[in-house]
Amino acid sequence: MKTQDDKKLDNPVWFSLSETHQNFGVDYGSVKFYYPDYCPFGGFEKGDAIAKSIDEYSKMVDNFFIVGEKPELSNLLKLNKELVCLQMIVYDAIDIPTKDKIVKLTDQHIDALYELVNLVQPGYFKRKTALLGNYYGIFKNDVLVAVTGERMQMNDFVEVSAVVTHPNHTGKGYAKQLVVHTVNEIFK
């Protein structure tokens, strides 16, 4: 599924909130953020009042992330950390078999999903994040031990997110199987 819109991936939060997820965010004009109870991410396009808009959003949260280029910030905010992230694109379904039972997570799994993701990657996953897309898990002895799902979504792309395995269950291929399953579900 190669597309001419690959450039949207340079600013994924902006385009997700401009397209598929427009009902999940705060729109300040040239700056857009997910509502804090969904995801603490924002993005911006060149324009006016970027620092002021970011200051406004900062009143709603303890911390947040700007994805993409680094904006100019006001003196009201302190930059805590800069992260370099790698972005990979899958253009076709993946032909790798899965051996473990993969379950589509529902409302009854939200607490277990939230706890597992925040055990491994604290701060990025909120209670309502799972409402942004489908999430899948592997259970062992009725305990959720590995997950992945769909977070940011725009018209042509879906982020595979929350690729998490409980530390006591790593090295068993669960993440690989879940990524394959999630990617293939996206392509259906």
Language model segments and positions:
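Acyl-donor-binding surface of acyltransferase catalytic domains
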Residues: 2-97
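Conserved active-site alpha-helix within GNAT-family acetyltransferase domains
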Residues: 73-76, 176, 188
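A short, internal acetyl-CoA/4′-phosphopantetheine-binding micro-motif in the GNAT/acyltransferase core
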Residues: 40-45, 163-171
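Conserved acetyl-CoA-binding loop-helix of GNAT-fold acetyltransferases
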Residues: 49-53, 165, 171-186
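A conserved beta-strand-loop-helix scaffold within acyl/acetyltransferase catalytic domains
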Residues: 124-166
